[in-house]
Design a protein with these regions (language model features):
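N-terminal secretory signal peptides that target proteins for export/translocation
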Residues: 1-17
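Intrinsic disorder/low-structure terminal segments
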Residues: 2-5, 30, 75, 149
Length: 192
């Protein structure tokens, strides 16, 4: 009898604990759903497609890397790759656009090319701005372009640069991880 009472008490206690957990979860659902709804409405669902389209329209002229160099873009740091998550490619940076401290969808600071022997294929762009310059002129808020918030690359960083904000847009090569993710596993530096 003692054994049965102990087992019954144990089962009742476990049941009460499970019911308490369930009650807490049910009570939190409205708050979790509200956070989810805010997160979903914080970005315009058309923005990714719109930003990719705008970038393609403004960079079509740079499909030929020679047009990029004629427009003031030049290779910076060689082909950037990661050990287990693809690559970024070769960044052709326009230092004049970087130095102006502004962001303009029609004038990305960097064009990203994938090397193929002595040729280059345009795969995306990177918008860049010095963080101190941007924050001083924009009420200490990070840049946002068509609903996409830029990432801060702090110092020290692998490029030995002062802190900067950046946003990749894979407009010319699909990225399974997303159009605005830094690394693209469909881009490679092996073709150099």
């Amino acid at each position: 009898m003692n054994f049965q009472v102990s087992t019954r008490t144990l089962i009742q206690t476990q049941t009460r604990v499970r019911l308490a957990h369930l009650a807490v979860l049910v009570a939190l659902v409205p708050f979790i759903w509200a956070d989810y709804a805010v997160a979903q409405t914080a970005h315009d669902h058309n923005s990714p497609a719109k930003l990719v389209r705008l970038v393609r329209e403004s960079t079509r002229q740079f499909l030929d890397v020679n047009a990029a160099t004629e427009a003031g873009y030049g290779p910076f740091l060689g082909c950037v790759s990661g050990p287990d998550h693809g690559a970024m490619g070769i960044h052709y940076v326009n230092l004049g656009l970087y130095a102006d401290g502004e962001i303009d969808v029609a004038h990305p600071e960097a064009l990203i090319y994938e090397p193929w022997g002595d040729r280059r294929r345009l795969v995306g762009v990177e918008f860049l701005v010095d963080s101190a310059t941007w924050l001083a002129g924009h009420n200490n808020t990070p840049p946002v372009l068509e609903g996409q918030v830029f990432q801060l690359v702090a110092t020290p960083n692998r490029y030995n640069l002062p802190a900067f904000f950046e946003l990749h847009v894979w407009a010319w090569r699909d990225n399974p991880a997303g159009a605005f993710v830094d690394w693209n596993n469909r881009v490679s530096c092996e073709g150099q």
